[in-house]
Amino acid sequence: MAKGMMASTEARTQTQQRPVTRELASFASKLRYEEVQPEVRKRVLLLTLDQIGAALVASTLDYITRVREYALEESPDGLSTVIGSQRKLRPEWAALSNATAGHGVETDDYHNIALAHPGCVPVPSVLAVAEQIDARGHETIVALALGFETIIRFGLCVMPSMIKDRGFHETCVMGVFGSAVGAGRLLGLDPETLASALGLAASHASGTTEYAESGGEVKRLHAGLAAMGGLRSLSLARRGFRGPPTILEGRRGVFQAFSDEYRVDAMVEDLGNRWDFLTTAIKPYCCCGLIHAHIDALRALMAEEGLRPDDVLEIIVGTDPLSLVHVNRIGARPADMNSAQFSSHFSLAMTLVMGGNDFAHYVAAQSAGFSDPAVVRIAEKIRLELDPEAEAAFPEHFLARVRVKRRDGSTIERTRYATGTPDAPLTEAEIRGKYRRMAGGIVGDATANAIERAIDALADDAPARDVLRPLSAGARRS
């Protein structure tokens, strides 16, 4: 799909007037639970579980705490749960805090072709509204499916140009529309009002990827800003405040504003019959998804060739063009957690020296000031280069070739697809195991299990409020 995704200027001109904003709004407003295929419903629940686990594991971090404290200070009391607090806030403020946490440690989901994170904005947005209006499970599943799909479809329209050519961050640019569509469906907005809300949401679309060049914590906040922006846009639209109903496809709409190359029709092609978010990847490692294939190839060399740090003269990572831009800049000496997670050099060195790339490994690296001599020594021996096979496969497939020159004069290499993607998917048991490790380590097994049961119960039309209710019960780590 992606090879034909990018349109010429002539083709864009011919298709840009298709009213995809209104088509999307109409579809979202009218979709019924019975029309959502069983495999779609099941995937919604697993992605929701994974996202809540990601938010819980990040909830104790300093920078997440600062955002939560800001929300608690600014918001009046409400009905929406704030992860990490016993207070409940207005939906937009709870979503700001929870979405920032959900995107807070690079363990949330991602999509190869759309190059997007579909879960971290719709899940907190939809659940915050669901708590406020006491929504049931089936309508919540529909809303989440629409939020996920909106983000992925947006990515299919504008990626990879939006990030590679313009440097915009997909989570905030696309996420605000996923928030608006998902929560707007839950609120029962008619097509005209929802289209207007999308027009307003565009004014919240923002965020660059400069964090991948020089670090900073702002990337985490992009999910929160998108969630809040989507909900605020809905509130204004419901009061009659209008936005342009051609905001996606228009001559001065968001597609042309954020991308050099885009395809308007991808937003609505076969909508309802084909759900592109089904191929969303769930991360096994706590770092940028572009690095995962690099890690998998290196892990194969460790397991199959007995590779050790002392063996290494040089590590050459053959990869795709976007990785050369997005995870190749920071190098061997990251300044903070975010930059470590966007450094292929440092993350691969952690794999070889520390034995893994879980959240706990990055916390340990942070405790050492990201300057552990053994890790830095290996990181300085790593370089990235363009690999023809990886380039040809990208973005449908995340592929990497890792070649290691050893001190004994030999060279070994492995090629791997990224674990967690459709090429090497995690099983349902592995996804649930990941959630239980993340959530159980923060709130205890009893609370984590109660949340998991409540998410599964959405399929039986249980109240959506039950999903985060265990956190409000004051359960402590067990």
Could you describe each region identified by the protein language model?
Residues A101-V158:
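Hydrophobic alpha-helical hairpins/lids featuring a short glycine-rich hinge
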